[in-house]
Amino acid sequence: MSLPSIPSFVLSGLLLICLPFSSFASATTSHISFSYAARQRMQNRARLLKQYQTHLKKQASYIVEGNAESKRALRQHNREQIKQHPEWFPAPLKASDRRWQALAENNHFLSSDHLHNITEVAIHRLEQQLGKPYVWGGTRPDKGFDCSGLVFYAYNKILEAKLPRTANEMYHYRRATIVANNDLRRGDLLFFHIHSREIADHMGVYLGDGQFIESPRTGETIRISRLAEPFWQDHFLGARRILTEETIL
């Protein structure tokens, strides 16, 4: 027995009825998929934002804004920490100490006890290296130093911002103050041009009484020299002051 044929207009009607349901189902599925993906993105963004906010809170404990008040607070905090480590400082200078006499004779008194102590820390570190060999590129007491490496080693742990590495970079360092030849103070950096008239390719640290400590050249050892010697006078470029109340820890 054959099935009755379905009129074409009935088939057309059924097709029109089914198509909306099919489109609706497809759209619903797509909408669900889109909503899930959107929620996932939002959750991921929220998680990343929370992680970033946590990171900022941790950073806040040691990030210092660039205003004078916060910098003063940081220096005071650092000084309190330094007080807890007296072993960082050399023995106090006695009235008979030649180094104190040099300061008194030159009438170049430091502006505070803290600045004086910090300066002596640097000088003490420098003098501990006397007799050690010159090593080009050296920055370590167990290996040796070149001229700027010696200063880099002795000064960077007591400064808010690290010094650059080479003598010429230190000579042009913006945080350093230009010092007149008749105003030299213990701890000032001295610069010389040995191989060029325009570039600072050697340096030392002024100790007072016309003396400075230096790591001279290959084959020599770290020593104390006199600035008044003709060789140094002929090659002297100038002095810079990096140890001040504003630059030290």
UniProtKB/Swiss-Prot annotation:
Subcellular localization(s) per the UniProt record: Cell membrane
SUPFAM superfamilies given in the database record: Cysteine proteinases
Domain NlpC/P60: 116-243
InterPro entries recorded: NLP_P60_dom, Papain-like_cys_pep_sf, Peptidase_C40
Keyword entries, A-Z: Cell membrane, Hydrolase, Lipoprotein, Membrane, Palmitate, Protease, Signal, Thiol protease
Transmembrane segments: none
PROSITE patterns: NLPC_P60 (PS51935)
Gene Ontology BP annotations: peptidoglycan metabolic process; proteolysis
Signal peptide, first to last residue: 1-17
Gene Ontology cellular component annotations, sorted alphabetically: plasma membrane
Predominant localisation class: membrane
Membrane topology per record: Lipid-anchor
E.C. number: 3.4.-.-
Enzyme class: hydrolase
Lipid-substituted positions (S-diacylglycerol cysteine): C18
Keyword Lipoprotein: yes
UniProt xrefs under Pfam families: NLPC_P60
MF annotations from Gene Ontology: cysteine-type peptidase activity; endopeptidase activity
Lipid attachment locations (N-palmitoyl cysteine): C18
Active-site residues annotated for this sequence: C147 (nucleophile), H202 (proton acceptor), E214
Family, as annotated: Belongs to the peptidase C40 family.
Official protein name in the record: Probable endopeptidase YafL
Species this chain originates from: Escherichia coli (strain K12)
